[in-house]
């Protein structure tokens, strides 16, 4: 079905992951007083923006995708959806998504949505992904935007809680993406994409994965330590982050099956961020920590 082709180029898995994180950020900032309509429009609007970014990314990456085993059957590569049609579809999604955010949220939330979109489409997809080993680092910023948009839509401000979310989700993106780059090493090498394993080697990538997870674990603890979440979130953050770190350290064992290990690190990264997104949605503190407001 032609409709399915268009749905697939929006990358539904990415949309679902971002939907969970934006809802988590919104509920954390709402502190039990949830505006249902605002939440619905925020989640829907940002989901459309993310879908638009994914479609435009498919259009930009057609030449790269054609070289990779994982992506060579995408509709924009095979011609099942023309680039012109995909561009029209992607831009229409952007208009709808940003329209909803502008209509129902606030300038801070919209500003972060614009920032994430511009970084992902304009900076990461068009240039950094192809040219720099730091492409993953730049792309991590756009991946960290959804929970911040949700948080700012509900709170109307960018405070310490939003800053922690931005840092936490940016840090999470790095080992998550590096794990993918390891078990998809051949694809990235064939397409000449300078991800860290291809450009600097597996050993350096393993070290970066461990270091980023360690810092992520510390930053995740800042939400409960700063009074934004409670002990339940702290327990979930500690258990998931430390187990993820343990899994990463297993990569240094002798005779480790590299691809299997990388897939395990990747898989648990999704479990970790999903658990934390759900945790912060329900284990919020009813009274905001007023001393931590940075910008209001």
UniProtKB/Swiss-Prot annotation:
Keywords: Cell inner membrane, Cell membrane, Heme biosynthesis, Membrane, Transferase, Transmembrane, Transmembrane helix. GO terms for cellular component: plasma membrane. One of its GO terms (biological process) is heme O biosynthetic process. InterPro entries: Protohaem_IX_farnesylTrfase (IPR006369), UbiA_prenyltransferase (IPR000537), UbiA_prenylTrfase_CS (IPR030470), UbiA_sf (IPR044878). It is a multi-pass membrane protein. HAMAP family: CyoE_CtaB. Belongs to the UbiA prenyltransferase family. Protoheme IX farnesyltransferase subfamily. This is Protoheme IX farnesyltransferase 1. The gene is cyoE1.
